[in-house]
Amino acid sequence: MREPLVSRALKISLYIIFAVGVCGTITLPWMIDSYMRILYDAYYIQEGYRRFIIAFLMLSASLVLVIVWEMIRILRSVPIDPFVMRNVKILRQIGLLLILLAVMFFLKCLYYVTFLTMACGCMFVVCGLFAFTLCNLFRQAVVFKEENDLTI
């Protein structure tokens, strides 16, 4: 069966996002240095902020890259058999990673508060809860599929 256009477009987009994300994560320290040189005169930047923000963004980017890769793994299984326990586990892992990202962003607000940080934290919570909902939906679909396979 031929893969739907939307599925192919999403898979290609995720591969591009993953590649750009890897490049961005690798070059992050240099990008932060350039950013801080430009904005140093405009804002007072606390001592140690550079190390903190690089560590925070590297960890966040790494978690997002894992999430994107797991989404690619799910999309690979769609043409073959989407309703398998492996996809349930992947969706649960994605949900946990999104909640972890939300916690990280809210903890960052204790050190350096920005509206965007709070908005991202809220978005990660909602997306994490949605991933858990999809996980439960897929789990039920797997059970129904296995019951159906046994009756045939």
Predicted features and spans:
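Membrane-cytosol interface motif
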Residues: P82-R92, D149-I152
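Membrane-helix interface/capping segments
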Residues: L65-M85
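Alpha-helical transmembrane segments of multi-pass membrane proteins
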Residues: A19-D33, G128
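Hydrophobic alpha-helical transmembrane segments of multi-pass membrane proteins
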Residues: A55-L65, G121, V125
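Membrane-helix boundary elements
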Residues: T27-A61
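Hydrophobic alpha-helical transmembrane segments of integral membrane proteins
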Residues: K89-L116
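Alpha-helical transmembrane segments of multi-pass integral membrane proteins
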Residues: F106-I152
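Alpha-helical transmembrane segments and their helix-start/interface "positive-inside/aromatic belt" motifs
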Residues: R2-A19
